[in-house]
Regions:
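Core catalytic lobe of class I
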Residues: 1-264, 275
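PRPP-dependent phosphoribosyltransferase catalytic core
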Residues: 265-280
Length: 280
């Protein structure tokens, strides 16, 4: 006997049903193909960690004193033919990201001097309202082996709300002040790059992902700007740090990643948390 389905009685129920295939999953696919399949106004916070577009030369960088290879960011996913192509990629992605954000949702966009100014401009062009910039000071940065410029020891996070008119976005002032046990919440965070057991490696012992973010960074971001039960989106999730930390902190999450080996590593990393990878 066929079971009669109960019709949803609210927009919330409709959204919940449409969102079910995405929740608490790392989805193997291109975010520009997956995001349009998601319902509008459904996520509470976004962590946006796009390619840096470093434009590195094809030659290998060698540490001149010890003659070893520098493991920089020279992956295929970081290559674009021009600034125009890169900007179009950012704009198209952020348009879809903004659509799936709730009106009071916030986004954390991270980058280096190579791309963060372009990201900030596009965020403003699309109607996001910037709340803060956070300077992440790396306690253990990669030295500048060529001795031609200062060692780049920071990255910038732009924290923005979807709409300027939103006054009820989530900000946990107590959690913010707990950072470094400060009386006031400062926008400078000193956190080391991930290392040791936290840094995922391939079979040859090399870094699996060149820009894996430390869990401590995501813990601060998620604690300050979301509450338990909130839905966190990471459209370019890499090896799954955002979902891993979100799950530990009692949040729901949606992760998208197009590189299969990263998805496989994320699934293995999160097996104890009952995460599954799917391809839509």
């Amino acid at each position: 006997m066929a079971r009669k389905l109960k019709a949803p009685n609210s927009d919330f129920e409709l959204t919940e049903r449409a969102l079910a295939p995405f929740l608490d999953r790392i989805i193997l696919g291109d975010c520009l193909e997956i995001l349009p399949q998601m319902p509008s106004s459904c996520v509470d916070m976004v962590f946006f960690d796009p390619p840096y577009f470093l434009q590195l030369p094809p030659k290998r960088l060698i540490r001149w004193r010890v003659r070893t290879v520098v493991e920089g960011v020279n992956d295929a996913w970081d290559k674009f033919s021009s600034f125009d192509e890169y900007d179009l990629f950012l704009r198209r992605t952020l348009e879809e990201v903004r659509r799936v954000m709730k009106p009071n949702a916030t986004i954390w966009a991270i980058g280096t001097y190579h791309n963060i100014f372009r990201i900030g401009t596009i965020l403003q062009d699309l109607g996001f309202w910037i709340l803060n910039d956070i300077i992440w000071v790396k306690a253990n940065p990669m030295p500048n082996w060529l001795n031609v410029r200062f060692t780049n020891a920071t990255e910038t996070l732009i924290w923005a709300v979807r709409d300027k008119a939103a006054k009820n976005y989530m900000f946990d002032a107590k959690a913010a002040k707990a950072i470094d046990n400060a009386r006031i919440a400062l926008n400078v965070w000193r956190i080391p790059l991930c290392r040791g057991k936290e840094r995922l490696k391939d079979e040859a012992g090399r870094k699996l992902h060149s820009t894996q973010k430390p869990e401590a960074l995501l813990e601060r971001v998620i604690c300050v700007s979301s509450k338990p039960g909130d839905i966190i989106l990471d459209p370019m999730a890499g090896t799954g740090t955002t979902g891993y930390v979100a799950k530990k902190l009692g949040r729901r999450f949606i992760m998208i990643e197009k590189v299969e080996k990263y998805v496989e590593a994320a699934v293995k990393r999160l097996e104890g948390l009952q995460i599954c990878a799917t391809s839509i």
